[in-house]
């Protein structure tokens, strides 16, 4: 900022501002001045654009006008929310000195820094989404990645081995703010994300990270957390923790542990798969018609967030899955009783985080009290459920009767928003507070008595006693009777139609009342802070209970969904394979106006790949996606939309479904398709579930068919993954005849004249035709174009045998049986008579043939 160059020429107040701003050069500084937060210079210009507020000028300092913008202090949360949503960070600078006793500018300091990844205020957070701060680190061996949800204390790290895995993690976690080292090499991974923060290299130093983490957890080493041998992850975690402490300006007691996330613990899904399956976000970027929109009928925000974490990290531990299944089954008869009580618990998880940060507001404590009041009823209902996992969950929930009693005594039923407004602590909680309040509240009675007495003493019927926030207490007499005011009445204020006076007795009482109000408010703030001190020793138990309540909400929700939507409990088997009887797509069946056609699926070591053919709009993509979604739901422990499901081990789910140009990276549709295909061929295993839809369609027919054939061969013969391979290349239906483990299925349709009816049912065998022209007509392509297309189709189908030796079912020309072209060198040799050549001619022919090869 150029203003710093002439520092001594500025006014004392602007010097104070510039010193504070120099400590936070990269972020906006909200500088408190009375009832406003002001921004100056470049901050003011930036804020006026981001917030659409007026840009003005504040006089001059150092001979230059000062650009200025301001917002009222009481509306600051709304403006902070707008800035945070745009990825901005803000330093909040408050007046901490007393203006009455200050010589020069009032003392100010930055009391907190609001950043997109470290917010905990209820008004700034999306209640049903995690809000993560993340840090990324890279060295020659791979990546380190750490995430922290400061609104819950959940701290995780991982070590993605390659770029694709790192990209998948970024999409899964979708951090609100991402810290990266100043020499980070893979900038294309993170470019375009909001909330990027460039950090110096020393913040990622491994020894500093270990020291930071041990200090936070009160441990000597990190062995107990299972992260000791994760140096790259620890580098990221150390930077992240230091950043969180720097911005919060307080201890973080709710962050008590760190967990290592390992690839082998969950089903891996790359970024393309998460996008294509529309788990929590649809392809248009919204939340409608996603898997979460169907499954998430949780009644608490913390339950909703946990369910979304489960959906994005399906677990592979069948012990955990069977426990969840058992719990869901046991709870199905209890959902109607449990959900109304759980709804009253609210977002206890985030309230506890604000308690730990000492930023909890009075209404947070009132909500906490209300949550505690539900626990006895919840525990009583759960006690009647005959299920060991349910009882284990119940044991994690304390009753906290003492804390409930404390909050019932301490906080009024409906407290104000802020403690500074007063009236938070209940009557009877503190004797001294009650005395000060009685003195302040008794003012009304006193004023009424004084008014009656003075009116009788003076005989002035217009006399009345009142209070004004600016001038304090007064005795008011109309202008017509003011000349009759007693001599001891001292004029305090003149109005148009009246005079206001003060008398020594009233002045003395005013001082007493105002003192009592100030002391009552100061004592109330002290008692409020003491409540934190009484609650915080129980923080660990409270967080454990909040986690158990969130899990109960998820499981009760899944039980309700299973019953309402007619889901069945899947069976886990040890061998490779998926067998589904009458499977349904969980989202499509909810949005269709007509009944959904359920379909079977059978994948096993002897039937690893299904070649799926059929018309456009016939349901191939729906069939493939429903298989992946049923597998995903099974591996979060949920019941699934089918009559019966048996499912074996799955380590990864891959999808190559649809594509669009990646213009920002300069990649065409076909390039995107091939990149995703390469990722599958490199990383899939025999325990992977692979969905391949229309491979090779983005290039020439020969190239596309050849690639599709080779990919199918590789997946079936080399990788041996469980694969659903949808295609319009009818030549691929020959694959089952050429290799084992492959079968043909198709989705049927009926054509009548120019109309087509899609049956949406899966049948064995290959489709007889593609119905492409019928679908085009259905889409509204002009009739003359359809007519010309039919003519061209007949020409192509009747093409000479030299161009296409074989046809598939008489409807599509074969592209695999095109005769190979003869080499020019071979043709020349066939026409050559060696006996007629001279030695010189023979030598010339050798050179000629050499040029033809």
Swiss-Prot record:
Role noted for this protein: This protein is involved in the repair of mismatches in DNA. It is possible that it carries out the mismatch recognition step. This protein has a weak ATPase activity.
Keyword vocabulary terms for this entry: ATP-binding, DNA damage, DNA repair, DNA-binding, Nucleotide-binding
Residues annotated to bind ATP: 614-621
Pfam families tied to this protein: MutS_I, MutS_II, MutS_III, MutS_IV, MutS_V
CDD domains: ABC_MutS1
NCBIfam families linked: mutS1 (TIGR01070), PRK05399.1 (NF003810)
Organism from which the protein derives: Shigella dysenteriae serotype 1 (strain Sd197)
Family statement drawn from the similarity comment of this UniProt entry: Belongs to the DNA mismatch repair MutS family.
PROSITE patterns recorded: DNA_MISMATCH_REPAIR_2 (PS00486)
Record-given protein name: DNA mismatch repair protein MutS
UniProt GO BP: mismatch repair
Gene Ontology MF terms: ATP binding; ATP-dependent DNA damage sensor activity; damaged DNA binding; mismatched DNA binding
GO CC annotations, alphabetized: cytosol
């Amino acid at each position: 900022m150029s203003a710093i160059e002439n520092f001594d020429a500025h006014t004392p107040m602007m010097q104070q501002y510039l010193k504070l701003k120099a400590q936070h050069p990269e972020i906006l500084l909200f500088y408190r001045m009375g009832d406003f937060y002001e921004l100056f210079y470049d901050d003011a210009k930036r804020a006026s654009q981001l917030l659409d507020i007026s840009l003005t000028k504040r006089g001059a300092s150092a001979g230059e006008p000062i650009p200025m913008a301001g917002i009222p202090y009481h509306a600051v949360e709304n403006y902070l929310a707008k800035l945070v949503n745009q990825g901005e960070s803000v330093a909040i600078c408050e007046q901490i000195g007393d203006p009455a006793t200050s010589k020069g500018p009032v003392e100010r300091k930055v009391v907190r820094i609001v950043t997109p990844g470290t917010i905990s205020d209820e008004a700034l957070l999306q209640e049903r989404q995690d809000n993560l701060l993340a840090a990324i680190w890279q060295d020659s061996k791979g990546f380190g990645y750490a995430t922290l949800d400061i609104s819950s204390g959940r701290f995780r790290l991982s070590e993605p081995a390659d770029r694709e895995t790192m990209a998948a993690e970024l999409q899964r976690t979708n951090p609100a703010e991402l810290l990266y080292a100043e020499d980070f090499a893979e900038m294309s991974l993170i470019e375009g994300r909001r909330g990027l923060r460039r950090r110096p290299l020393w913040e990622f130093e491994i020894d500093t990270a270990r020291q930071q983490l041990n200090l936070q957890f009160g441990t000597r080493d990190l062995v107990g957390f299972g992260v000791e041998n994760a140096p790259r992850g620890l580098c990221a975690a150390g930077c992240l923790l230091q950043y969180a402490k720097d911005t919060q300006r307080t201890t973080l007691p709710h962050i008590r542990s760190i967990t290592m996330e390992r690839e082998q613990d969950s089903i891996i899904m790359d970024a393309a798969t998460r996008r294509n399956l529309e788990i929590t976000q649809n392809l248009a970027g919204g939340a409608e018609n996603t898997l979460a929109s169907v499954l998430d009928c949780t009644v608490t925000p913390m339950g909703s967030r946990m369910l979304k974490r489960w959906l994005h990290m399906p677990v592979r531990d069948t012990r955990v899955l069977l426990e969840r299944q058992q719990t869901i089954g046991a709870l199905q008869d209890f959902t109607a009783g449990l959900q109304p009580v759980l709804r009253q618990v609210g977002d206890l998880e985030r309230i506890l985080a604000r308690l730990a940060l000492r930023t909890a507001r009075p209404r947070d404590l009132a909500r906490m009290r209300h949550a505690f009041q539900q626990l006895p009823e919840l525990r009583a209902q759960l006690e009647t459920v005959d299920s060991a996992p349910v009882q284990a969950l119940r044991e994690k929930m304390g009753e906290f009767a003492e804390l409930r009693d404390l909050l019932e005594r301490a906080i009024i039923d409906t407290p104000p928003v802020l403690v500074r407004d007063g009236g938070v602590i209940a009557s009877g909680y503190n004797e001294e507070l009650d005395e000060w309040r009685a003195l302040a509240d008794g003012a009304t009675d006193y004023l009424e008595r004084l008014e009656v007495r003075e009116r009788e003493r003076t005989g002035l019927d217009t006399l009345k006693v009142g209070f004004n926030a600016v001038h304090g207490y007064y005795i008011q007499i109309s202008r017509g009777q003011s000349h009759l005011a007693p001599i001891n009445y001292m004029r305090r204020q003149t109005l148009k139609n009246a005079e206001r006076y003060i008398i020594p007795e009233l002045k003395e009482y005013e001082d007493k009342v105002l003192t009592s109000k100030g002391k009552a408010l100061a004592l109330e703030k002290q008692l409020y802070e003491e409540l934190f001190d009484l609650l915080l020793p129980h923080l660990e138990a409270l967080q454990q209970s909040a986690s158990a309540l969130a899990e109960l909400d998820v499981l009760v929700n899944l039980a309700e969904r299973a019953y309402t939507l007619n889901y069945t409990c899947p069976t886990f088997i040890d061998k490779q394979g998926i067998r589904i009887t009458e499977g349904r797509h969980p989202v499509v069946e909810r949005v269709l106006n007509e009944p959904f056609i359920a379909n079977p699926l059978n994948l096993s070591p002897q039937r690893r790949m299904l070649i799926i053919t059929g018309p456009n709009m016939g349901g191939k993509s729906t069939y493939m996606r429903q298989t992946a979604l049923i597998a995903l739901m099974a591996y979060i422990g949920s019941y699934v939309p089918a009559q019966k499901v048996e499912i074996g081990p799955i380590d990864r789910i891959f999808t190559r479904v649809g594509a669009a140009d990646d213009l920002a990276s300069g990649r065409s549709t076909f390039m995107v398709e091939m990149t995703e295909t390469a990722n599958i061929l490199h990383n899939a295993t025999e325990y992977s579930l692979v969905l391949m839809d229309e491979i090779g369609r983005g290039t020439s027919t020969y190239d596309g068919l050849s690639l599709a054939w080779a990919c199918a061969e590789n997946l079936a013969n080399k990788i041996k993954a469980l694969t659903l391979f949808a295609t319009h290349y009818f030549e691929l239906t020959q694959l089952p005849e050429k290799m084992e483990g492959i079968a043909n299925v198709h989705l049927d349709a009926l054509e009548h004249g120019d109309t087509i009816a899609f049956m949406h049912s899966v049948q064995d065998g290959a489709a007889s035709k593609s119905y492409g022209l019928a679908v085009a007509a259905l889409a509204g392509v002009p009739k003359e174009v359809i007519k010309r297309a039919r003519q061209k189709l007949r020409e192509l189908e009747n093409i000479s045998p030299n161009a296409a030796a074989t046809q598939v079912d008489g409807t599509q020309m074969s592209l695999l049986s095109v005769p190979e072209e003869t080499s020019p060198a071979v043709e020349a040799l066939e026409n050559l008579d060696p006996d007629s050549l001279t030695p010189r001619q023979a030598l010339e022919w050798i050179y000629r043939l050499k040029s033809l090869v």
